[in-house]
């Protein structure tokens, strides 16, 4: 019996600690899915201007005619009726790129803003540069990323040395344009 006593004590202590951790998380967990964080608010103001913003939790109830797609994190609506999508896409970093794509009523891109990026400083983080993000404003339809100077209206130039991150931003914009085209925008 004495040879099993340390095992039993260790198992009991581990079980008690695990239960305490579970209880602590249950009492202190805050669901942030309906909250506009400071970083998201900054991105909203950059892309859509000053104003009041709210997250739309139920797209059908709001009258958009579709359910929230899996590739969209949040739909943010400004009090003037304009909307933006928060989209997390793959970049070079495993954490991805958290992007905000604001849309014009005609379905073109109003502005693109970076909520957060954890890519290589000086390379992947260059997708935050205003010159790169400005390429997307006014664009409609699916965009293609090119390494050289764009020759067509549906092309945007990648950031040199940050192809993965540039591809991620372009993917986020393409997702936003596609989802916006499916929305019933009558409200």
Where are these regions (language model features)?
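Flexible, solvent-exposed loop/hinge segments and secondary-structure transition points
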Residues: 2-187
């Amino acid at each position: 019996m004495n040879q099993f006593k340390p095992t039993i004590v260790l198992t009991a202590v581990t079980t008690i600690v695990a239960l305490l951790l579970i209880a602590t998380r249950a009492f202190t967990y805050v669901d942030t899915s309906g909250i506009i964080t400071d970083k998201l608010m900054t991105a909203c103001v950059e892309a859509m201007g000053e104003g009041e913003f709210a997250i739309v939790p139920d797209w059908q109830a709001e009258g958009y005619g579709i359910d929230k797609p899996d590739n969209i994190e949040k739909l943010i609506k400004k009090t003037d009726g304009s909307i933006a999508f928060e989209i997390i896409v793959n970049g070079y970093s495993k954490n991805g790129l958290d992007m905000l794509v604001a849309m014009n009523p005609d379905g073109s891109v109003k502005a693109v803003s970076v909520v957060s990026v954890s890519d290589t400083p000086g390379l992947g983080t260059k997708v935050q540069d205003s010159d790169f993000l400005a390429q997307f404003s006014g664009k409609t339809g699916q965009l293609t990323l090119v390494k050289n100077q764009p020759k067509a209206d549906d092309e945007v130039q990648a950031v040199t040395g940050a192809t993965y991150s540039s591809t991620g931003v372009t993917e986020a914009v393409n997702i936003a344009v596609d989802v916006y085209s499916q929305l019933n925008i009558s409200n």
